[in-house]
């Protein structure tokens, strides 16, 4: 009986002493699934962290200022970070990826940032040239200026119309000449523009009621609006719909 007990104890000690040692951290490059006891041998690629948010948004045409990233070894020593922002194209709306990487003797770590380039309010602002198929019944100004409205989702088209009606006896003896008249208030949502119904009063001689909607292109230098209008001015009055293209 004593011999059997000694054999059991010896066997238990042998089993205990044979437990496999190694790296038990799944994040280490040398992690061992078979290891039951960590022996402090774990090795790691650099720990890398973004400066700033993982997602950033800028308007088309803006300068992208990259915030970079930092990396350290497991012992706290710093590691140089390589940045690849070659994919970012600020001249075209879209989502782009910036990749950061850092290496040591155990391998390479990487992390990414998403840069969203969008059509924003500033892309709508400025002087534009208009081409259209509207005709005299909806006499758009060929060179309006767009300015920011009261909020970030509002813009104003200054000098919406350009009207030239020669004198007509009795009806309009002095004619009507407005080089740049009226302001159009519109709302924007990214590359979308909406012109709610509004009325332009042409010096009390008639009105132009209109509304519309449209879209800006991905490069922020052209947009199109489909208008619906009803013009009560003498000589050029009429109702209908047309399309205008604004370009920079």
Across the structure, where does each feature detected by a protein language model lie?
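Disulfide-stabilized cysteine-rich extracellular repeat microdomains
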Residues: 28, 33-36, 40, 55, ...
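Short structured motifs
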Residues: 51-53, 67, 82-86, 209-211
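Serine/threonine-rich, repeat-prone extracellular segments and beta-strand-based repeat modules
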Residues: 74-115
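Bacterial Sec-dependent N-terminal signal peptides
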Residues: 5-52, 107, 114, 120, ...
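Solvent-exposed, low-complexity, repeat-rich "mucin-like" stalks and linkers
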Residues: 46-76
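Ser/Thr/Gly/Pro-rich, low-complexity flexible regions
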Residues: 120-248
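Residue-level recognition of well-ordered beta-strand positions that form the cores
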Residues: 70, 101, 114-116, 129, ...
């Amino acid at each position: 009986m004593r011999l059997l007990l000694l054999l059991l104890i010896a066997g238990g000690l042998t089993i205990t002493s044979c437990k496999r040692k190694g790296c038990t951290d799944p994040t280490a490059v040398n992690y061992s699934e078979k290891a039951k006891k960590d022996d402090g041998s774990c090795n790691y690629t650099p720990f890398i962290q973004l400066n700033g948010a993982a997602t950033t948004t800028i308007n088309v045409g803006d300068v992208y200022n990259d915030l970079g990233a930092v990396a350290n070894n497991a012992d706290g020593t710093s590691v140089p970070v390589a940045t690849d922002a070659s994919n970012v194209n600020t001249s075209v709306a879209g989502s782009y990826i910036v990749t950061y990487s850092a290496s040591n003797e155990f391998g390479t770590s990487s992390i990414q940032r998403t840069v969203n380039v969008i059509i924003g309010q500033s892309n709508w602002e400025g002087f534009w040239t208009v081409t259209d198929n509207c005709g005299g019944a909806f006499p758009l100004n060929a060179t309006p200026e767009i300015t920011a409205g009261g909020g970030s989702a509002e813009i104003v088209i200054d000098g919406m119309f350009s009207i030239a009606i020669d004198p007509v006896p009795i009806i309009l003896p002095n004619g009507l000449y407005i080089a740049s008249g009226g302001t159009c208030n519109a709302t924007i949502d990214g590359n979308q523009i909406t012109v709610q119904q509004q009325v332009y009063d042409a010096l009390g001689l008639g009105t132009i009621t209109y509304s519309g909607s449209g879209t800006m292109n991905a490069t922020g230098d052209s947009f199109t609006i489909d208008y619906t209008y009803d013009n009560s001015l003498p000589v050029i009055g009429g109702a209908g719909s047309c399309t205008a293209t604004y370009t920079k």
